[in-house]
A protein has these predicted regions:
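N-terminal capping/small domains of soluble enzymes
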Residues: 1-77, 114, 122
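Alpha-helix-loop-beta-strand connector modules within alpha/beta enzyme cores
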Residues: 46-73, 148-187
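Aromatic- and acidic-residue-enriched carbohydrate-binding clefts of CAZyme catalytic domains
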Residues: 36, 49, 84-106, 145-163
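Structural preference for beta-strand elements that scaffold enzyme active sites
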Residues: 27-28, 71-75, 132-134, 183-189
């Protein structure tokens, strides 16, 4: 973490850090959290997977990991309300408005764009040569924020019941399955750590 370039492109430092794990014998090597939207950046030096300008570095990384007989997986991430204001140069976004963090609710169209961008990031990872992706739905980040009844107060199809609160996640999963090869690995990271959220 915190080693990539400001525009989300892979740095030599992060390339070395990750490929050392594969070279050391890890059966599976996963990137650190890679943000799928610029507004979803969670920390300085975060790897990005939201633009084709990042594709060359991702391709180089996937190839190097796999050259050591390690499975290459990209972790897809959106920080949501946990994005620092100064880092994204504006208010962070979330499932609903949140006074404590100063985050604003995504419109329904913006939610659909988040879903599209997660799917596009998975497609980009596949193009780069990764064997699969993991959706970061833990640690109070955006997917977790949608799942939380305490944070998600939406009245559209992405709020209310558990099925609706999980709709962002299930639509991302369905979109990846529809657009990537059947053998492309897909995992979801969930955590019992709730960061004060009721799920």
């Amino acid at each position: 973490n915190c080693q990539s370039n400001d525009d989300g492109t892979l740095s030599d430092e992060e390339f070395k850090w990750l490929t050392m794990r594969a070279e050391g014998g890890f059966g599976l090597t996963m990137t650190c959290a890679a943000h799928v939207q610029a507004v979803g950046r969670g920390f300085p030096g975060q790897l990005g997977i939201f633009g084709d300008n990042q594709l060359d570095g991702l391709t180089r990384l996937a190839s190097a990991i796999k050259s050591h007989d390690s499975i290459a997986v990209a972790q897809l991430h959106h920080a949501g309300m946990r994005s620092p204001h100064d880092l994204i140069e504006g208010p962070p976004v979330s499932a609903s408005d949140d006074e404590e963090t100063g985050s604003r609710a995504l419109s329904t169209d913006e939610v659909k764009q988040v879903i599209t961008d997660f799917i596009s990031a998975a497609i980009r990872a596949e193009r780069a040569g990764f064997d699969g992706v993991e959706l970061h739905g833990a640690h109070g980040y955006l997917i977790c924020q949608f799942l939380s009844s305490e944070i998600n107060h939406r009245t559209d199809e992405y709020g209310g019941t558990l099925d609706n609160r999980a709709r962002v996640l299930t639509e991302i999963i369905d979109g990846i399955r529809d657009n990537c090869a059947s053998e492309f690995l897909l995992g979801v990271r969930l955590s019992p750590e709730r960061f004060g959220m009721d799920l």
